[in-house]
Amino acid sequence: EKHYPVFAGSTLPVKKLGWSNMYTSMGITGFTFALTGEAAVNPQAPDVSLPFTMCHEMAHRMCIAYERDANFAAFLAASSNPDTQFQYSAYFMAYRYCMAALSTVASQSAVDARARVEAGVNDYLRYDMVQYDAFYQTRKRETATKVGDKVNSTYLQTSGDSSGLASYGEVCDLLVSWHIQEILLPSLAVEENPFDPLDKTQVDLTGIVNAR
């Protein structure tokens, strides 16, 4: 709320989904009940993704409907949270979404980029990457996941989100724009009035002149 007032609102706790095994078999990590406004997450999802998913479902609760928008809202909220676990989750998930998007248009570039990233990470981050991949690779082979994806995609499309499941990954466009505007451009900006020790309007040179 401090950085993004749009998030000011309900602070009701995010609940734990019951029947976790069923939701896990369908590849569902979180859910927002439209009729009650309750947000819940699947406790069996990878730990590293839970803070981000909590923020994602809370975004839905605040009527941020489209998945790409809810994902971006989750990134902003989690990355601004003073809790470092939320910050870590935000950037971890942003990385995963962007790498997945890159792999669809330039698979070898994605492989090369991931190799460079993973070569420099510590063992804890590498463990989270392995666990995250293992969770989703296992679920992809389950029939229930395919059915769940189809139902979810159809639901999103009938709700006005024409991209269906692809909407989740479209957050990459927003993430890249945010990085350019908030990180890249400010770092390239030239200081308007750089300090010049010989500029008489910035420094009193009287003492230097008299000392000659």
Language-model features: locations:
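Active-site/pore-lining binding-face segments in mid-to-C-terminal subdomains
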Residues: 72-132
